[in-house]
Amino acid sequence: GGEQSGHIADVGFDLYMRMVGEAVNDYKTGIIDKEEEAPECKVELPINAHLAENYVPGERLRLDLYRRLADVAKPADVQSIREELLDRFGELPEEANALLAVAQLRALAKSHGIREVVATGKFLRLAPLTLPESRQLRLMRLYPGSIYKAPTRTALITLPKNPAWNPSKPAAEIVDTSLLTWVTEVVDQLTKASTT
């Protein structure tokens, strides 16, 4: 569309068409590597985590920050965004800190191939997660009532009883980030366990 016509105006139509043709040919012949995208990781926790309008005023900038946070691959990327927010907008409000913590959790989960971190009912669901039998027993000992389904590589970890984490409450009301801390510890424990 309009973005392409800007490129065409810069280089001229004939040169632009030749460049596009060469790029398509390079891609088809394998000269350009087809990038493997890291699997998406869905994190669903009942917690208030967002960038408020009164903190980051521009909608376009907020959307860009959300995209960047969703794409982070390692904790250092989250730290870089945290420093940028501090520099541009000052001290982070609670919900912005929670959003950065969710991004760090997502990066940790992605780095171990986990695509789902979901609090549902009375369980935290992690999938896919491969646990050898010794680690399954450890899971049951550390988190009584938990279930591991080997065929689907799904761990259902019993959530601690805490009224602030009630999934029936709207997420906007939940400001307690201890669930997020607990989930991060669980993912860290189980991924360390699955790599030994």
Where is each model-derived feature located?
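Accessory helical-bundle/CTD segments and flexible terminal tails appended to RecA-like ATPase motors
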Residues: 1-196
